[in-house]
């Protein structure tokens, strides 16, 4: 039905055989531990062959399933509506319909919740958590495999030099971002694998310390004093709890050691359109977040 951007999740498959009505055999070209979790991920869910044949390339906009709700409407950047499935195998849902609204800006989500415009929201900006402490709200917190990181353009510009990349890492006060921007709801990353993957996490790793003097020394060694950096930041989006505040804090830290940083902000989909193809010829760095189902997938 069209290009599948996450096809690499299943690139190890060499054959699929039907054993009986309830059994399928997958043969892989090598051992691949995340395969079962990938099948349980949304990208691995079973779809209706009839629906694929009927809708073709439009199948993604006409989802079909066996859940408690059935697809009703999809208006881009506005809403997705699902209605109660009267034929659900496990009885009917308790509500007639559910409306999903893509409110990428965290402050907008908060305002809508406080005004009664929505009944449920995810990714509450940490600075807004206190607004939902009253008995009329229920807040659920969960630790997850979520990583916020910077994409550095190492192919050209200042960050093509390893010393300049290291300088940026020393220059950014990550503890301050965790405490002041994310209100203590995160931890400083020591590597790309989050602590939520306890079995795959190396507790012996230490993050780069905050050392602006070391950063300045590396910049001087690289001859990059006053280097101009273009920094792409999204206004909000999937996994982005407070991206502008985080980007502004990063900008201030980098400028404190001698960089000249210019932030360019984008709406989420426009941001992805700029960042996903690569930063070459456009920017030196970009803010990004990722949540994954196993420690082997992107961005690792």
Residue ranges and their predicted role:
Residues 24-25, 67-70, 80-81, 96-102, ...:
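Short, well-ordered beta-strand elements
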Residues 155, 159-197, 242-245:
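Periplasmic-binding protein-like
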Residues 6-50:
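Surface-exposed binding/hinge segments that line
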Residues 21, 40-93, 97, 213:
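Gly/Pro-rich hinge or "lid" segments in bacterial periplasmic/extracellular proteins
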Residues 85-131, 248:
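Ligand-site clamp/hinge motif
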